[in-house]
C-alpha cells in the first residue's frame, strides 16, 4: 500500500497557571510510522531555537529553553518573571525563523470544591475511587478540569495525570450542587513495553491503595481551553483503540500548519490520605 506523504506540523503546547510561570513545549509532529529515538527527538522533533514570548499588562518576557521537571519530556521554554494571576489575560508569541504563531488565554478565578472523599463500594472494598461534590456558580458559565497525582508505597507520579472525565462544563447543572466520580485516566501506553506485569498493574491503575496520598487539582478553564481538553476526553477513551477513528482536536494557536494549545489554568489542590488502617468514607484533609 502506498501511503501519501505526511506533512509535518508545528506543535505548540503551552500553559500558565495561577502562582506559576509559563511553560511552553515547541516541537514538530512526526509520521506515525517514522522511527523515534532519543537522537531523533533531540535533533528533529524538539525545536530548541524558537523565540517564545509571553506578555501580560504591557510587560513581556522571553522564555528560556531549559531543563524542566514539570515538562513531560524534561525540556521546555520556561518563564521566571511573569507569574500567573487570576483574572488576567496572557498573550503568547512563538517565532520560528520567519514564521510567527500567536495565541491568548485567560486565567479564571480559582474554584474550591465543597468536598472530596474516597468512595468505597462496600465495607470490604480496599480499592476506592474518588468522588467530589461541587456547587456551581449560577452567574457564570464554568468549564471544569481535574488532574490527579498519587504518591504511594510504590507508585509516585512525577506529573499530574489527567482524570476521566477530563473536562466538562456546567450546561446540565448550572447553579446546582452535584457530585461526580473522578477516575485516574490511564496514562500513555508509551512505556508499557518496558514494564513488568506488576509494574503495569501499578502504573495503570485507576483506583487507590492503602498508603496512598492522593492530590486532586481542580481547574477552571476559559472556553477555548475547554474545547481542547474536552476533545481530549474522547481521545483518552478511544484513542488507543485501533478500530476507532481519531477525533479532530481544536487548536487555539494562530498561524500556518500548526496544532496545539495555549491554556490558562485557575487551580486549587486538595489532598486525600488513605492510611493503612483506613475505613470507608474517610474524608478529605484540606490544605
Positions of the model-derived regions?
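A sequence/structural signal for flexible, mid-protein segments enriched
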Residues: 1-287
